[in-house]
């Protein structure tokens, strides 16, 4: 399976949040992965700029995507700037976006999960119809690969710890790295 971060169904919004003109490549990657028969999931960090998430789900479904995850905008990398922090959704705003998203995902036959631990109470998430209660999956259920091949504990872990390079290091060496094992144990 493969997960692709898609910030929006609108090129201008996706590109503004990513900081580069990458929407076309992102969509092409999704289409190629679906055409190759891979299980494709999109991930969308939610903020005030892309709060029309239901439209993104509709777009993803039209590309053949059946799995989606979303999260709050995690303050890491360039998302720590004052302007970026100002776009974070409040708990009530996030709940409203998720309520619409759960309904749309169900109508499209998509599976939707929210992946930000401790952002919303478990009761709220269950009340919205979300079955999976988020917990940190760094080095356990997910890792991320940066454009140069560097492996990091998760897509939100963009500073500090690196676990190897997928282009030059065997996967087993990366997986069994003491840092990786320590993060899994936390």
List each language-model region with its residue ranges.
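Membrane-interface junctions of multi-pass transporters
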Residues: 130-134, 157-186
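Radical SAM enzyme [4Fe-4S]-AdoMet core and its adjacent flexible, acidic
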Residues: 5-152, 158-165
């Amino acid at each position: 399976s493969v997960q692709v971060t898609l910030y929006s169904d609108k090129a201008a919004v996706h590109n503004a949040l990513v900081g580069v003109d990458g929407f076309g490549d992102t969509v092409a990657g999704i289409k190629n992965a679906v055409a190759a028969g891979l299980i494709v999931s999109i991930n969308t960090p939610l903020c005030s700029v892309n709060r029309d998430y239901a439209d993104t789900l509709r777009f993803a479904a039209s590309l053949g995507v059946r799995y989606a995850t979303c999260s709050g905008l995690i303050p890491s990398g360039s998302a720590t700037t004052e302007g970026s922090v100002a776009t974070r959704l409040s708990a009530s705003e996030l709940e409203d976006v998720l309520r619409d998203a759960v309904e749309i995902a169900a109508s499209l036959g998509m599976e939707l999960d929210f992946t930000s631990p401790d952002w919303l109470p478990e009761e709220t998430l269950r009340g919205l119809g979300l079955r999976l209660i988020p917990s940190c999956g760094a080095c356990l259920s997910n890792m991320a690969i940066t454009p140069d091949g560097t492996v990091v504990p998760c897509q939100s872990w963009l500073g500090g710890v690196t676990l190897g390079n997928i282009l030059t290091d065997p996967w087993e060496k990366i997986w069994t790295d003491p840092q990786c094992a320590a993060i899994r144990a936390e």
